[in-house]
Regions:
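Catalytic cores of secreted/periplasmic lytic hydrolases that degrade extracellular macromolecules
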Residues: 2-129, 141-258
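Pyridoxal 5′-phosphate
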Residues: 138
């Protein structure tokens, strides 16, 4: 009988230790997560409007400087818009080359580039529907001047992600960046864009479109675009394809601020 009691007591003590360990682990993870929040929402808005930041919005067919109201509305994580701009896009999703090419069938220079997009996803672990949607937004559905290649020294240079394309002279600066990177084919531009996004944003813990645009940990710094609707515009494209293909929307996080 004493042996049975000792075994039960030992088991009981072990269970208590496991429960305590689990509680401490939860508390520790919560504490670590909270420590990643650096600003309240209003503080983040103020920093985003600080000196040296650029916030643009499209009105009447042209880009103008965004007002504080425009910025605050765009940064609001509790708006009624879809949540895909808050989804982790640093993970691969399962798609066939045919499915990607079906999306691209009437998309200009991007037509039949499904294989390249999937290779970029596999090599750099960047969500392929994000890559496609971002490219479509930046290139006007594959038909913009920059998308179709800028000729220089007999070669054409391509830039599908607006990388290095500053607002005041997007075609010139975007093509110059593409030339420096030797993006001499659509495939190279797709692969190079994915590499750039992985290395410059995902490795900086900016894993969602919202984080790439607004950088909640360091508002006003290291942001992909100046357009206040940039993340929502790409997310709108993504939603169409996610819904059409019935792909699950995983790892959505909107808890950025104190």
């Amino acid at each position: 009988m004493n042996g049975i009691l000792k075994k039960r007591l030992t088991l009981f003590i072990m269970l208590i230790i496991i429960v305590i360990f689990a509680i401490l682990l939860i508390i520790n993870e919560t504490h670590l997560f909270d420590n990643q929040k650096t600003h309240s929402f209003n503080e983040a808005v103020d920093k985003q409007l600080g000196e040296g930041t650029l916030n643009m919005t499209e009105k009447n067919g042209r880009f103008v400087e965004a007002s504080k109201t425009d910025v605050k509305k765009a940064m609001d994580v509790n708006n009624d818009k879809d949540n895909l701009n808050h989804m982790d896009i640093s993970e691969k999703i399962s798609m066939s080359e045919k499915e990607v090419n079906d999306i691209l069938k009437d998309k200009g220079i991007l037509k039949n580039k499904g294989e390249a997009f999937l290779k970029a996803q596999d090599k750099y672990e960047v969500n392929v529907l994000y890559l496609v949607s971002h490219a479509l937004v930046e290139t006007g559905n594959g038909k913009s001047e920059l998308a179709n290649g800028i000729e220089d020294d007999v070669k054409h240079y391509y830039n599908f992600y607006g990388i290095g394309a500053f607002d005041e002279n997007a075609v010139h600066t975007g093509s110059s960046f593409a030339k420096k990177q030797s993006w001499t084919s659509p495939e190279r531009a797709i692969m190079g864009g994915a590499k750039f996004i992985r290395g410059n944003y995902f490795e900086n813990e900016q894993l969602s479109l919202y984080q790439m645009r607004w950088n909640p940990k360091s508002p006003g710094e290291h942001q992909y675009a100046s357009d206040v609707e940039w993340d929502e515009n790409i997310a709108t494209f993504m939603k169409v394809y996610y819904d059409k293909l019935g792909i699950k929307k995983d790892h959505i996080n909107k808890d950025y601020y104190l």
